[in-house]
Amino acid sequence: MAKEGNIEMEGTIIDTLPNTMFRVQLENGHVVTAHISGKMRKNYIRILTGDKVKVEMTPYDLSKGRIVYRAR
């Protein structure tokens, strides 16, 4: 269901920020700021520090992203 041109990467939550924003360290070492996608917010999926997540980013701004999946 991903749109054309979006980049999906795996990462780990390293910090929790206000307004459901998170700091995520990607597998390649980069750190991005990410928010929760609407479906995860609607289904009350909780994300804690240390969780493995899948982050979707646009090629236009690689410093921000959207968390689309939390691994168990």
From Swiss-Prot:
Alphabetized Pfam families for the sequence: eIF-1a
Entry-linked PROSITE patterns: S1_IF1_TYPE
Signal peptide: none
Alphabetical keyword list: Cytoplasm, Initiation factor, Protein biosynthesis, RNA-binding, rRNA-binding
A cellular component term, taken from the record's GO annotations: cytosol
SUPFAM superfamilies, sorted: Nucleic acid-binding proteins
Keyword Protein biosynthesis belongs to the record: yes
Matches recorded under InterPro entries: NA-bd_OB-fold (IPR012340), RNA-binding_domain_S1_IF1 (IPR006196), S1_domain (IPR003029), TIF_IF1 (IPR004368)
Ranges for domain S1-like: 1-72
MF-aspect GO terms: ribosome binding; rRNA binding; translation initiation factor activity
Compartment list: Cytoplasm
PANTHER family in alphabetical order: TRANSLATION INITIATION FACTOR IF-1, CHLOROPLASTIC (PTHR33370:SF1)
NCBIfam families: infA
Summary of the function given for this chain in its UniProt record: One of the essential components for the initiation of protein synthesis. Stabilizes the binding of IF-2 and IF-3 on the 30S subunit to which N-formylmethionyl-tRNA(fMet) subsequently binds. Helps modulate mRNA selection, yielding the 30S pre-initiation complex (PIC). Upon addition of the 50S ribosomal subunit IF-1, IF-2 and IF-3 are released leaving the mature 70S translation initiation complex.
Similarity section: Belongs to the IF-1 family.
Cited HAMAP family: IF_1 (MF_00075)
Quaternary structure annotation from Swiss-Prot or TrEMBL: Component of the 30S ribosomal translation pre-initiation complex which assembles on the 30S ribosome in the order IF-2 and IF-3, IF-1 and N-formylmethionyl-tRNA(fMet); mRNA recruitment can occur at any time during PIC assembly.
Name of protein: Translation initiation factor IF-1
Species in which this protein is naturally found: Hahella chejuensis (strain KCTC 2396)
